[in-house]
A protein has these predicted regions:
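Phosphate/oxyanion-binding active-site loops and adjacent basic polyanion-contact surfaces
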Residues: 106-114, 158
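Short coil/turn segments at beta-strand junctions that form active-site/ligand-binding loops
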Residues: 61-62, 128-133, 174
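Charged, low-complexity interaction regions
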Residues: 18-29
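C-terminal functional segments of enzyme domains
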Residues: 9, 74-77, 133-205
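Short, basic/hydrophobic alpha-helical segments
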Residues: 112-135, 168
């Protein structure tokens, strides 16, 4: 698949997601038919002359997700998340998007960023089709430590969000790694942060 064609498909997917979901609807509640349409666009199956392709053709040896969250008032909200999915393939463009979330604290929003990014990847590729490692990067050391079992999660709301993510990642045949990196330390993390802030009307300098 040529780079130009790949970019067009990913933009089409992002547009489909934006049109289909409102700000509060969990991506995992999307309909089967809608997901099949997303897969067709992603794989080029919407064009008759392309022929069948495997989902694995979308990505390389590892998928990297960089995600971040932003909240105008902590606690209180409103809040938004942004994430960038890098398929580690030269001719495959990154998928980036942002959305509002219902989180009322920064830590809740950071968990939501990870959950929605993983959900989007699974909805796009189909969980059973993802066979390469997934590296999820966040700039929240607390959240990463809680997901990795390094620190306890005493807050009931955060514990529920953590368990949902662990259940989601545990359902995949591929391994999921939760990694910490400092704020804006990579172009992808900065992009994720900028997208979330832009959605909230925060100007980036």
């Amino acid at each position: 698949m040529k780079t130009e064609e790949s970019n067009k498909r990913l933009f089409a997917i992002a547009s489909m997601i934006d049109d289909h979901f409102d700000s509060s609807a969990p991506i995992l509640n999307s309909t089967y038919g809608f997901l099949k349409n997303i897969q067709k666009v992603a794989l080029g199956l919407d064009q008759e002359d392309d022929g069948p392709q495997k989902v694995n053709s979308l990505y390389g040896d590892c998928i990297t997700i960089s995600c971040d969250a932003s909240i105008l008032k902590n606690p209180g909200g409103p809040s938004a998340v942004g994430f960038v999915i890098d398929f580690a393939k030269k001719d495959q463009a990154n998928l980036s998007t942002a959305r509002f979330c219902k989180a009322s604290t920064n830590n809740q929003a950071e968990y939501d960023a990870i959950f929605f990014s993983l959900s989007t990847l699974i909805d796009l590729c189909g969980g059973a089709n993802i066979t390469v490692p997934i590296n999820v990067i966040s700039d929240s050391l607390l959240i990463i430590d809680q997901l990795n079992g390094v620190k306890k999660c005493n807050d009931e709301n955060l514990r529920h969000k953590r368990d949902l993510i662990l259940e989601l990642s545990g359902s995949l045949p591929a391994s999921v790694i939760f990694s910490w990196k400092p704020r804006n330390s990579t172009p992808e993390l900065k992009q994720a942060n900028d997208m979330a802030q832009n959605l909230l009307g925060v100007k980036n300098h």
